[in-house]
Amino acid sequence: MASAAAGGLPVLFSYFRSSCSYRVRIALAHKGVEHATRAVNLLKSEHKAPEFLALNPLGLVPALQIDGHTLAQSVAILEYLEETRPSPALLPGTPAERAQVRWLCQTICADTQPVQNLSVMNHAASLAGRESAKKEWASHYIRRGLSAFESGVASFGGEFCAAGVQRDEVWH
């Protein structure tokens, strides 16, 4: 896999249907960070190739090469971007508002998104012995998480930080 040299143009390793990659693309655009994108086709198992595993041993997208570093996990990438390129900000101004956005992120990252991951759903189906089990299993947790998310986001409103096209969309 092609990569950026230290100090060169950042390279985002991404899959077009990955919401994790999507949130990093949104953040890079919001912050005006020019970068190259390298497609990693998950359906063709390119994320399992030795070249990609050298970038991210978990074999997950996204991965970002930037400032001489290779970063993985979307929220860690967002935190790095926020700390190294603070303007324009991804997070709102007050500690309470930032905590709210982080809560929303964790609701998606930890409680909702993992169960919609194709590899997790396939594993659930194999355990249950029937294909329909994966959708039932995932739907249960996704509904629960999104319901909590909707309650949390309702307390914001109006600003880019949490409603409409929201920062929590970037951070989840």
Where are each of the predicted segments found?
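GST superfamily/GST-like fold recognition
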Residues: 116, 160-172
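GST-like domain detector, emphasizing the conserved glutathione-binding G-site
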Residues: 2-136, 140, 155
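Hydrophobic alpha-helical bundle segments that form small-molecule/ligand-binding pockets
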Residues: 146-162
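Alpha-helical packing segments of well-folded alpha/beta enzyme cores
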Residues: 141-145
